[in-house]
């Protein structure tokens, strides 16, 4: 299972056009996508946050590691679900399409794979903070998935990709900021 997750993450990042076509043909169920791809990736990010705090700080602080992993878990899960929900609403409101939350959960999950992979690397190796710029590559991943996976026409593709990328990238960040503001004990 973990090899398959790793292969899909690499495929989506390195060859998004080909990966989206394969994912569209695969036609997997929502539960399968979530339990075999998204949830394990969020688990990896959470474990990376825990280990990153334990091994990259000068002091060995278990409490701080638990706080970091809780904040990461809540912001990743919340960002994923809130992003899918918001895009489902925008899908109907702005793009005049029929709501399909299951489709959006899969699309946001696969589109977030670069963000999850970067979070894992940056939590374990914080010295490579400059890699954060590659998060903008999510725009291209969403662009390639808009046609084959979501069936978006060329004339509205740019607007679709702009909305989707902004929501995928901003919802976890907003939730993390809100958590830090509402619960100052989670800030460090």
Where do the language-model regions lie?
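Short, intrinsically disordered/low-complexity patches at protein termini
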Residues: 45, 54-55, 138-139, 181-183
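Transmembrane helix-loop junctions in multi-pass membrane proteins
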Residues: 50-63, 118-126, 174-179
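Hydrophobic alpha-helical transmembrane segments and adjacent short intramembrane/lumenal linkers
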Residues: 88, 92-173
């Amino acid at each position: 299972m973990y090899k398959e997750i790793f292969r899909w993450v690499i495929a989506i990042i390195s060859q998004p056009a080909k990966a989206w076509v394969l994912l569209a043909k695969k036609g997997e169920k929502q539960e399968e996508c979530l339990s075999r791809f998204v949830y394990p990736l969020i688990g990896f990010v959470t474990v990376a946050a825990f280990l990153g705090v334990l091994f990259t700080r000068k002091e060995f602080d278990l409490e701080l590691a638990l706080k970091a992993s809780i904040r990461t878990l809540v912001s990743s899960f919340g960002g994923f679900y809130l992003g899918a929900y918001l895009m489902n609403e925008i899908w109907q409101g702005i793009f005049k399409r029929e709501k399909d939350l299951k489709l959006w959960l899969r699309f946001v999950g696969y589109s977030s794979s670069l963000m999850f992979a970067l979070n894992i690397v940056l939590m374990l190796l914080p010295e490579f903070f400059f890699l954060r710029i590659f998060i903008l590559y999510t725009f291209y991943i969403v662009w390639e998935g808009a046609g084959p996976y979501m069936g978006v026409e060329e004339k509205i593709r740019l607007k679709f990709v702009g909305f989707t990328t902004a929501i995928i990238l901003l919802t976890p960040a907003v939730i993390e900021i809100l958590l830090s503001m509402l619960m100052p004990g989670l800030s460090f």
